[in-house]
Amino acid sequence: MPPIRQAVSLAEKKAIRDYYNQSAHRIPQKEVTEWFRKTYNKDLSQSTISEILSPKYSYLDDGSVRLGDIKKIRAPKFPLLDNAVYEWLQQREVEGLPISGDMIKQAATRFWSKIPAYASLPLPDFSNGWLDKFRRRHYIQQSAVNQALESIKFEVFREYPVHIQEFIRPYAQKDIFCVGGTSLFWKLTPNKQNLDYQEIQGMKRGKAKVSLIMCCNADGSERLPLWIVGYAQNPRSFEQCGIFPKSMNFEWKWNGRASISPIIMEEWLRWFDTRMQGRKVLLMLESNDTYQFGVESVRRFKGGFQNTSVFRIPEKTLDIKSPFEQGIVDTFKANYRRYWLQYSLNQINILRDPLKAVNVLKAIRWMLWSWNFGVSEKTIQASFLRSGLLGPHSEAEGQGMESYQKAIMEIGNLISSKGSEAVKQINEYIRPSEEDETKLHQDAVDTVAAEFLEERRFESDEEEDVEPQISNVEAAMAFEVLIKYFEQHENGDPSFVLDLYRRQRVIAPNNLIA
């Protein structure tokens, strides 16, 4: 006999979403199920919990709306379409573009043909009745259509730099953060054109791409885990090697364009604000519509920012720049390209095609090395000074670029390229203009529709690469080798050896090697 289905009220659904969204870290749905059982004495299936946490019920997160009003509004019949149209609408608002009821219906028609989940279904009638229900679901006033919303704006300073510095002055440098994004063609090889789009087994090399969200504070004491966006929800190399991104200290996201979408940016902003709990920090963002969309979405719904003041770096000024454009991204990419080229040459020496041998997991390890060790505190500090955000920056010119220069030299040695022209080509290889997505115009409907493409299991054309699962005993033995190695150093660091002992005992407390 099948279990009796238990009714879940809107108030209970809202409580589930609040519990999940307000947790300090992302919690598994199993934990949400257990919490609900203890709190409400009801047993819900994981599929029910998953549905409640899906975008279908995102309207429950708006704290300004009463549950009594919500009861009058039915959930959308096609939630993916509803979410896509709403995100498109918000992008139009952010960009200050005109909006009309007919434009909303036309966007819905275009989205229908681009969302695979609806490919086999007949096109609905996007009538005035559908439009009215859409407006009511998202609390869009009639006056808000035909004009861009003006209720929420950034702190934008377009006059003199001193105004910006006065705004920043109350914050200690450890509490001043900047976030930036970039794309990375992680299989890119150097050539005369610096970016070769020749086909590799039917896939252009430029398609082997990820996008990254980077964030650090002004004194370089905190660099947050990278957020890396690819094409596949769970890349084949992750599954085959049994790895967990959080254990490697990065967050993995995905969509059909491997790009930083407004939805991902909104999620990142909430994640950042939660990490800053108990502090009052300033977050500076590059001038980018995606970032602006994310900030406005956070401010408009779900309680807004609790620990963070947001400031957008002016787009057109000679005096103020993003710190990421003053050395941080260049240093990161130079170190990544160095690791990738060294790997490529090693594979060529053993008669393997590096473009097939590499996979996104290997590339991510080089990204993590480059971010955590290639970009030094000195590089970050000097980049903030050169940005002009903290005051006059002339004394910072050329500082903090040692890691970048070293990587440039090593890349030149790897490809046997020397001279001023070679340096120019290496610089263009490290930072090709095609990776700067902010300069490329994207159709708003296509951009949003990419969020709903079917899942991929791979990032690029690559060979199978299965890494064996490491047992506790094997890990403990590896620690034993490390411990003996450092014990044999006459001037070794005893605190480091003790730390190895502690970690070994955590891994295999009952299987220590004598």
UniProtKB/Swiss-Prot annotation:
InterPro entries: CenT-Element_Derived, DDE_SF_endonuclease_dom, Homeodomain-like_sf, HTH_ABP1_N, HTH_CenpB_DNA-bd_dom. GO terms for molecular function: centromeric DNA binding; DNA binding. It is found in: Nucleus; Chromosome, Centromere. Gene3D superfamilies: Homeodomain-like. One of its GO terms (cellular component) is nucleus. Its main location: nucleus. Pfam families: DDE_1, HTH_ABP1_N, HTH_Tnp_Tc5. Residues 69-144 form the HTH CENPB-type domain. The keyword DNA-binding applies. PROSITE patterns: HTH_CENPB (PS51253). Keywords: Centromere, Chromosome, DNA-binding, Nucleus. The keyword Nucleus applies. Binds to centromeric K-type repeat DNA and ARS3002 DNA. The CBH-binding consensus sequence is Py-Pu-A-T-A-T-Py-Pu-T-A. This is CENP-B homolog protein 1. It comes from Schizosaccharomyces pombe (strain 972 / ATCC 24843). The gene is cbh1.
